[in-house]
């Protein structure tokens, strides 16, 4: 009968430590791209909804990841990631 292999990989850091590190990185990145009052309001909304829980931490991580992804995808002027905007020359025709 087969046995499960023993875990011989490197020690993983605890989930809560990893989660807090990820949240800190996301907050630092978000502050560079969004207004602080807006981020503060988001944090207040999460706190009012979830309180001081891990569920709240996971929710704000998920929201910040989505916001930053969309922000970069649309074309952040600070980043080379995203849709390249082509300059259009007006020639009188509309292709809407």
Curated annotation (Swiss-Prot):
Phosphorylated on several residues by host. These phosphorylations regulate VPR activity for the nuclear import of the HIV-1 pre-integration complex. It is found in: Virion; Host nucleus; Host extracellular space. The keyword Ion transport applies. Signal peptide: none annotated. GO terms for cellular component: host cell; host cell nucleus; host extracellular space; virion component. The modification Phosphoserine is found at residues 79, 94, 96. Keywords: Activator, AIDS, Apoptosis, Cell cycle, Host G2/M cell cycle arrest by virus, Host nucleus, Host-virus interaction, Ion channel, Ion transport, Modulation of host cell cycle by virus, Phosphoprotein, Transcription, Transcription regulation, Transport, Viral penetration into host nucleus, Virion, Virus entry into host cell. InterPro entries: RetroV_VpR/X (IPR000012). Gene3D superfamilies: 6.10.210.10, VpR/VpX protein, C-terminal domain (1.20.5.90). GO terms for biological process: DNA-templated transcription; monoatomic ion transmembrane transport; protein homooligomerization; regulation of DNA-templated transcription; symbiont entry into host cell; symbiont-mediated activation of host apoptosis; symbiont-mediated arrest of host cell cycle during G2/M transition; viral penetration into host nucleus. The keyword Repressor does not apply. Residues 1-42 are annotated as: Homooligomerization. Belongs to the HIV-1 VPR protein family. During virus replication, may deplete host UNG protein, and incude G2-M cell cycle arrest. Acts by targeting specific host proteins for degradation by the 26S proteasome, through association with the cellular CUL4A-DDB1 E3 ligase complex by direct interaction with host VPRPB/DCAF-1. Cell cycle arrest reportedly occurs within hours of infection and is not blocked by antiviral agents, suggesting that it is initiated by the VPR carried into the virion. Additionally, VPR induces apoptosis in a cell cycle dependent manner suggesting that these two effects are mechanistically linked. During virus entry, plays a role in the transport of the viral pre-integration (PIC) complex to the host nucleus. This function is crucial for viral infection of non-dividing macrophages. May act directly at the nuclear pore complex, by binding nucleoporins phenylalanine-glycine (FG)-repeat regions. Homooligomer, may form homodimer. Interacts with p6-gag region of the Pr55 Gag precursor protein through a (Leu-X-X)4 motif near the C-terminus of the P6gag protein. Interacts with host UNG. May interact with host RAD23A/HHR23A. Interacts with host VPRBP/DCAF1, leading to hijack the CUL4A-RBX1-DDB1-DCAF1/VPRBP complex, mediating ubiquitination of host proteins such as TERT and ZGPAT and arrest of the cell cycle in G2 phase. HIV-1 lineages are divided in three main groups, M (for Major), O (for Outlier), and N (for New, or Non-M, Non-O). The vast majority of strains found worldwide belong to the group M. Group O seems to be endemic to and largely confined to Cameroon and neighboring countries in West Central Africa, where these viruses represent a small minority of HIV-1 strains. The group N is represented by a limited number of isolates from Cameroonian persons. The group M is further subdivided in 9 clades or subtypes (A to D, F to H, J and K). This is Protein Vpr. It comes from Human immunodeficiency virus type 1 group M subtype F1 (isolate 93BR020) (HIV-1).
């Amino acid at each position: 009968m087969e046995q499960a292999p023993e875990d011989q990989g490197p020690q993983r850091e605890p989930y809560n430590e990893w989660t807090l590190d990820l949240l800190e990185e996301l907050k630092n990145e978000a502050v560079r791209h969004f207004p602080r009052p807006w981020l503060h309001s988001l944090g207040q909304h999460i706190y009012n909804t979830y309180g001081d829980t891990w569920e709240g931490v996971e929710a704000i991580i998920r929201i910040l990841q989505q916001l930053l992804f969309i922000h970069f995808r649309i074309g952040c002027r600070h980043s080379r990631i995203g849709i390249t905007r082509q300059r259009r020359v007006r020639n009188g025709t509309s292709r809407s």
